[in-house]
């Protein structure tokens, strides 16, 4: 039994949150939430820099539990996060993408046209899986990430 998780406020019972979420969304499997100490080295394996900065910013809000890469039964692609707000007792899957909502405007000169095309197809499939999994979600496209960068998280990407 987990009484508390280091780095999570004492009045938040992570075990209860996980139990409630597993009943509400039995198709979703979560690991323990990220905590501030997870960000002390400036890097988390498998997480790109803008995901790292975004998660670090959210973890600094003690009312939020940030679960990394939730596994969803029937989904081949994994969303970036499941964010749970302990004040509203609700959460959402969160997927970050540097593509805009029309899948245009992504510039990376190091990648061939075929690589970009394949990446766009994968991202579209991932978003369709997220939309169809029965769990509330939000997709943050480049436009929203630009706004977040301007207002909240400088140097997000």
What are these language model-derived features?
Residues 1-157:
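Nucleic-acid endo/exonuclease domains
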